[in-house]
Amino acid sequence: MATLFSKIAAGEIPSYKCAESDKFYAFLDINPVVKGHTLVVPRKEVDYIFDMDDQDLADFEVFAKKVARAIRAAYPCRKVAEVVLGLEVNHAHIHLLPINSEADVDFHKHVKLSDEEMKTTAKNIYEAFKKL
């Protein structure tokens, strides 16, 4: 059975798309820790990131790097944090969070954004990604 993230990447479940390639898909987290909190997933279903084959993992990180640059271009910040947890959905994924301090990486806190804010955020990241 397809995972939640596979369905999102395939367009079966709506998402706030930030970037995509033939192998990877990036979209806003619907329960963001900070504005611009983006999830990056491989289209190929793999439960655990470190079970990915070496080349796929390398390509995944390069794609995530490009998404991080787009996030930073759209929403200037000191850094874009990369977090791998992988317990909530059984599909490898990377959290990218624009941060200005370590306190910004607190998964117990969330920001509420309207649908319009989410659409605008995704569009801004998507447009920045296309320019890279």
Located regions from the model:
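HIT superfamily nucleotide-processing domains
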Residues: M1-L132
